[in-house]
Amino acid sequence: MVADVVTSRINFYPYTVLPSARPVYQYDLSIHISNQGYSLDNADSCRALERFCEQQDAALGNNLEHGLFYSLIIDFPSSDACPISSFYSQIDLGSRPITHTVEFLSTQKPRRRGGRVGGMRNNIAGPPITPVQATVKVTRVRQMDPTDLMSMKILLNILLRRTFESSLGMLNIRSGFYDLRNPSIHAIQIDGRGYDICWIPGFRLTTATLRGKLGLQILPETTKVRSKSMNELLTERRGNIHPSALAVITVMAMHNGKVFRVHSIVQGQTIVSPLANGNETDYFTYYSTRYRDKIDSAGLSLLRHNDYCNSVMQQDKFILKLTPLKRTQNGKVVRPCNVPSSLCIIISDNEIAPYGVSKLSTNRAAVALSTMSPDALLEKATAFAARLAEDTELQSLLGDYGFGFTSNPLELETFVCKPPKLMMDNTSRIVTIEDDSGGVFHNLLQSPGVSPIYYSNNNQPATGMPVWAIMVPRNLGNDYARRLRKELTERVRSLAGTTAPNIGDPPLIAVELSNQRREMYRVEPYKDAFKALLNKLRLEYKDARESEIVAKIQLVVIVIPGPKQDRGDLYKGIKQFYTHMGIVTQCLLAPKSSQNELQWYDQAVLRSVCQQIYAKAGGAVWAPVLPPQNVYSKSTMLCALDISRPKKTVGRPAEVPISTAGFISTYDGSFEYIYSQKKTLVPNRLNHGGELQQQTLMEAFIKNSCNVYLAFNNRILPDHIVIFRDGVSDSQISATLEVEIKSLYECLRQIYHKSNRPMCDLKVIVAQKTCAMRFSAVGGTVLRSGYYVINRSPDNRQQGSEFLMASQAIVHGTTPKPIRYKIIFDSMEASVDNDSFNQLIELTNAMAYGYVNWPQAISLPHVLHMAHHLSKFCGEVLRNGDDLFESCAIFGLQYRPFFI
């Protein structure tokens, strides 16, 4: 494999463990409040913990100035309303739980209803005045080795967060830190007019492991906001200088990493103040008088720096009254607050969107609010690392816990893996070939019949899709049904190429839906429509039994009513019914009605639907091809296993959810034709989550996959088997090797021994999506898909070799989040310097281009991505019904991606 070497910077600064390092202990914190109607929050739980430490120090005779509380590393929750539940310390409190009864003063005041205490309410800015009695229980959870990378990572994340908020004076927004005092201004053009864009420079700090070392990665990150100030907007000639004149502008503001919409803007405008009868005052005086405490509290909690907060409020003489948005994506409602106007983000056209979105509409033109970093800021990130190395408070804090920090980044060679040689276009059926000399792409016409559709005809392979149907609700009308059938048929035939004559004309089946909304989403009318389809096919196949007629149906396109959020149970019911019958379905939402007319589908939607129909019927929409010199281009079977574990049942937290295992294997040289298997892992008292079943499960999966491969490859087993595994952390690798891989290897040895074949080259690769590493380009280097780093680990405890790859599309500045691929088992024990290892990387990158629904690269190999879809579809939609475990028919449901 020939890979381009790219000049890049990782900005990875290793940490080392000093000889003075001591073990760190993790503790659980449990606080029981005696006061009636009291709700424990973050601040009060910290006060209770402080009182607990004072009593513990008094009992042990410790120095109160540098006692237990001083040594704690508190894991503060992300929400102020949540209490502290755990902390860390190098002081050992013993293995037995310690309990103290404490008293502290809270800022919450008791609410009185009818002379009784009915709960507590917040006194945001006032001093703590309400006495609260609590029982605090501290339990040691575990002892962490100072050399353990995960324990160091936990401590570093907490220590860095505490240092930044206390001494460096930077604003923490999500995982980035921004300095609002040093913005740089740039200009962009929108609709021929220039708009000032304010780039707020910041840095993303992540702790990651690389080459067996824990380190701090510092990458520059920016936030683009409109730099035009609120004062300039208010003083523009808009007819009436009143906040209501800004109706065409939606103002968003940041507060504690959340986004608010501005309810009103107050600056220098006179109103009749309710503070004094009949007297006029200005908005700023009115709001600052009425909401002074709330404004101060919001500013202090936002910046956590008194001097900076006061200077901001003195310079900008107007206040933003913020109201929460409707609901965020995770269902939480943000609370209203007041913030200084200098922290506002201005977005035109009343666009309401969360912070950090990729595109927003401004005067019907796209403006990117990018969180990626321009190349010029990489030098600032390096300088920022030197600043951290010189920070005395940080160095002292790290030294107390036995950490050493270097200001010199770790240098690594980085490469770019080339995209697959052949890539089939999804509409024009053009094959794209890359020129090795200059990287130029040439388009060559290709016969569209390279990926014919296969179907079963009396258990014999045939070509085409003669029997399929379209079910349409009757209320959509005949014109809609005929147009839909015409467009779907033409598009599928264009995809089929030379096999197009074998694509039959689908019959239209009317579905009798009720006009009542409650009765519209019932599955029974679609079952009746299936009976009508069978009756129509009986006229053509008079002598065939019903089971034979059902076996002839290749696919059914079903139109279901919208909107999308209301069709959940109907969609699941349809999928369960037809999958049980062994029929592949493609669901399509009914179009929206506008002025008594149906809006037709977007062409991109129809193209995607037809691609799914073509793939579900047994065709390959496109096929990435490896170079002939790659050893995995011939006689290779790819496998992927993913286990879906749904959330626990609401109301019954003690119940263990049923897990679903999905297994995908390939049996064709193009790696596009798959064989799917599914099994339910039933938990019980001796087998809590079904883990003990995975040993026999993997053996059954690989036996069936080998039998399928034999059937399609002249009874010859593959020379190479590569298994991708998802959902395995570093702590689970040893158990996975012992439970799954060991028995799997012995099973394969028996299979190959019976076939008189030498044992295959078996590789098991774990894909970890939680990698925090990022790669950045320098000097105007253009990053492409397939950017990777070979991670050679000198640590003998780290099993196998690994590489980090960002295979999906590259955006400007930095790569997307890479995937960490760790080879946990290799029967050939290939070195990372071996060509076989590089060819394995090339295989991993090429398979990222094989997913049916996306014509470009995705983040994972398509077999692993489809294994995830299979397990999730069977667990959530099919509700763990009949297992797709063994099949007698070669061309059955398991040979088609019915779950995408």
Curated annotation (Swiss-Prot):
PANTHER family: EUKARYOTIC TRANSLATION INITIATION FACTOR 2C. InterPro entries: PAZ_dom (IPR003100), Piwi (IPR003165), RNaseH-like_sf (IPR012337), RNaseH_sf (IPR036397). PAZ domain is absent, but Ago is capable of binding small RNAs in the same way as the other Argonaute proteins. Keywords: Cytoplasm, Developmental protein, Differentiation, RNA-binding, RNA-mediated gene silencing, Translation regulation. The gene is Ago. GO terms for molecular function: RNA binding. Belongs to the argonaute family. Ago subfamily. One of its GO terms (biological process) is regulation of translation. Its main location: cytoplasm. GO terms for cellular component: cytoplasm. Signal peptide: none annotated. This is Protein argonaute. It comes from the Eukaryota. Residues 229-313 form the PAZ domain. Interacts with miR2. Highly specific binding to the mRNA m7G-cap. May be a component of the RNA-induced silencing complex (RISC), a sequence-specific, multicomponent nuclease that destroys or silences messenger RNAs homologous to the silencing trigger. It is found in: Cytoplasm. Residues 555-879 form the Piwi domain. SMART domains: Piwi (SM00950). Plays an essential role in growth and, with Dicer, also involved in microRNA (miRNA)-mediated translational repression. The RNA interference pathway is implicated in antigenic variation having a role in regulation of variant-specific surface protein (VSP)-coding gene expression. Several VSP genes are transcribed but only transcripts encoding the VSP to be expressed accumulate. Antisense RNAs corresponding to the silenced VSP genes are detected.
